[in-house]
Structure formats: structure tokens, C-alpha cells
Design a protein with these regions (language model features):
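Internal, conserved structured core segments that host functional sites
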Residues: 1-17
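Hydrophobic alpha-helical interaction segments
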Residues: 13-121
Length: 121
């Protein structure tokens, strides 16, 4: 929820975790490294696939896979790296294809996601 974004950011920061509040492209590419754990706190897109874990709503793998493909904030993960992440997700997690396609359609990248699914499934 948008109102809780800042509160969640400060909560994560208070746990001494690397956290970023709605970072822009330059911050993402300069300070967020794939080999270090970092938390990116952003408001959710409406109707985003989420799940409750320990009483907290968190994004599902389907949301992350779609957002990496279309969100400019994740441009540094696009291309070959995103293909690798998609392949790993299908190999290691129970990805709900219907949910993935529904959210991809909402974000206007359904054909691209369908192409990836054909490669990995």
C-alpha cells in the first residue's frame, strides 16, 4: 500500500539492511549489486500478485518476473540477465503461469512473457 511504503522502508533500514526507497535508474545501477542482499521498497501496482508471509504482504515471484522485464528501474537486469532469472525461477519455484500471464497482460508485455515461457517450460 502506498501509505505504508515509507514506514516499511524505515522498518527495513532499522534492521540494518541495505534498503532503497523507490530508487531511480542511476541509484539502481550505481548502488544495488546482485551479489549483496538489498531491499527495494516501492509502491505496488494495483492488482499486483502478492502473498501474505508472516502477516506481511510481499510480491509473488510472478510479479517480480514481469516487473524485471518492463520496469525501467530494473533496466540493468534486462537482457541476458533477465532470461537467466526467468529460467532459474521456472527451475526452482512453483510459478503460476496463469497469474504470470494475467499480470504481464496488465503491464502490456504478455507476448514477451509468452515467448519466454515457450523457451523454459
Amino acid at each position: 500500500e502506498r501509505d505504508a511504503t515509507e514506514t516499511i522502508f524505515h522498518f527495513v533500514q532499522d534492521m540494518n539492511e541495505r534498503s532503497f526507497l523507490s530508487p531511480k535508474e542511476d541509484i539502481m545501477s550505481d548502488y544495488i549489486r546482485l551479489d549483496k542482499r538489498s531491499f527495494i521498497v516501492k509502491p505496488l501496482v494495483s492488482e499486483s500478485p502478492i502473498q501474505e508471509v508472516n502477516g506481511i504482504n510481499v510480491p509473488r515471484i510472478e510479479k517480480l518476473l514481469v516487473d524485471i522485464q518492463c520496469d525501467r528501474d530494473f533496466f540493468y537486469l534486462q537482457g541476458q540477465e533477465s532470461l537467466y532469472m526467468m529460467q532459474n525461477a521456472f527451475a526452482n519455484y512453483n510459478v503460476n503461469i496463469g497469474m504470470l500471464l494475467r499480470y504481464a497482460s496488465r503491464r502490456n508485455i504478455k507476448p514477451q512473457i509468452e515467448k519466454y515461457i515457450k523457451e523454459f517450460v
